[in-house]
């Protein structure tokens, strides 16, 4: 099997230092628990806090004695929830997610989630991450409560920001939340990712992972512990380097990530938090493979090493660097609570690709009939924003208000080039080679107000309204598709009411009901026309969400279930043709389903886990299935956790989907079975503690079937596919100093 050698060059002194430190030791081991987040509570003030903040309770806790179901569960509901949610704690992230993985790999275990990682965990941007059939861009993703994403289409570049080692917990909220839930496309749910919490104890924790496809991860974590001289300051730093050839041929990736978090107490009631992250990626990216290529070259065919071909790996590469930072203030006094987060984030992507990497477009440029044609591009955006929340206990409840403001600037250009001649402009004059040159902005403003009414000690009602306002501006010298200039602006806004009720029947059993309206501005692509006012696609997506559910949680059993119904108007779908995503208004759709998940402690260290969903997502007019919306999902697993030993065997099934509209491009259901185990040595070795060795085997049964329609070729509209990555292995060594 041919692999990309250039992506695994020997690292310089920094990488070597990580390797030596990791071989001598490796990261601190701490079991995770979501118990604090899911424990029953009669404190309605705490229980009614915004659900996207609950993940902050998912800190790592050392498990002693017999572990409870909440401490073991890969995912679980919450007894303080007002909508369906799956809490993914620190234990699952540390034990079951690959060292190269990201949040999309972690949430793939959840009910109703369909995730495609064609090159292996975190080794390529996720091609598909759907929740209940909602595609990326139709649900919200936050980091420490801050919404982020690409304003072009509201999607998320999954490998370009935080790593699994930066992540402390995740909540998959399958619902719109209340009025205080801020972000884009909240109607499809919110994936709330929270960062690691600094420890009160000083430690240095190097780690090393290596596995299939010459995958290597070197990293080191630092916890300063509480510093009494500065009033109890704590800080966490993670520095990580990774490289892999990837599952797909010549689809290597190199990645560097630095993350830091500082928490500074100010007095007894106020805390300042500073977070900064930098990420750099160099990678080679295939667009998919035709059935003929799968049959001829195998299911892992991606790119080639032929410089005369448009799929030569050096012609199909990305250079991406990003940063994410914020300053947060939290203060609580005399019944008041104030939270404010001032943030900025950036994404800077330079990309190159062959004109038609799948071989249907012949070579030839303005310079030579045998030269290789291609394209180069840039997509660069920066956001500045602020999230402000204030609440006050008033009467029999709490009133909450605040706002989210975000201003994102974006530069996008693309040129036709001659790959053979070092990407020279493929046009005469050179200006004829310009496909697009555009700048645009998106302003988002979402003020809200809601009241949480404590009807009794065990029941509360939360009602409120949010005002969503989006303003797009474009100034294109060369507009995409038309090739002509465009200077245009458009504003969309709507009031979004919501109502949620929560009942606590016993200390172990709760239920909820929810109703809310959703709204999302059209994608930037609706401006890719001579006259955007005449475009039928220039309509916001709108929904009405209804759902009810219940949760049980005691020491031996966590169990939750829900049913939902969502009425969707102006559903925007997409189709990838020749590597270019084309959007269109599919009209209306109805989403309905049933979801459940649970964990039961059998005893003697053993627990059984399962989840499942029955989902129906259909077009209102034709009753055809919405593309990439599985009709069911399921998971079943056996977990062993006793003392220093952990092991799990978990199978995830994704049901039948259609890759395109009109019930076309059927993709069969499939199952992937993963095994993970680790052992933490009881005895220390000098200053080294919690010495740990872990192993993961993904896709045990080596299922390599087609799992996703990646798009179509530009020349002949031939379907392109991705397959499930082959069986892979990963070994991790870690320890903690001091």
Stretches with model-predicted labels:
Residues 220, 328-333, 337-353, 504, ...:
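Membrane-embedded beta-barrel scaffold of Gram-negative outer-membrane proteins
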Residues 271, 319-352, 357-358, 366-479, ...:
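Face-selective signature of the C-terminal outer-membrane beta-barrel domain
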Residues 35, 161-205:
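A beta-strand signature from Gram-negative outer-membrane beta-barrel systems
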Residues 70, 85, 95, 101-147:
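Extracytoplasmic beta-strand/coil segments of soluble accessory domains associated
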Residues 282-284, 288-289, 293, 409-411, ...:
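Surface-exposed extracellular loop regions of Gram-negative outer-membrane beta-barrel proteins
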Residues 32, 454-457, 461, 558, ...:
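Gram-negative outer-membrane beta-barrel transporters
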Residues 203-205, 210-243, 247-286, 316-334, ...:
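Transmembrane beta-barrel wall of Gram-negative outer-membrane proteins
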Residues 2-4, 564, 569, 603, ...:
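C-terminal beta-signal and adjacent terminal beta-strands/loops
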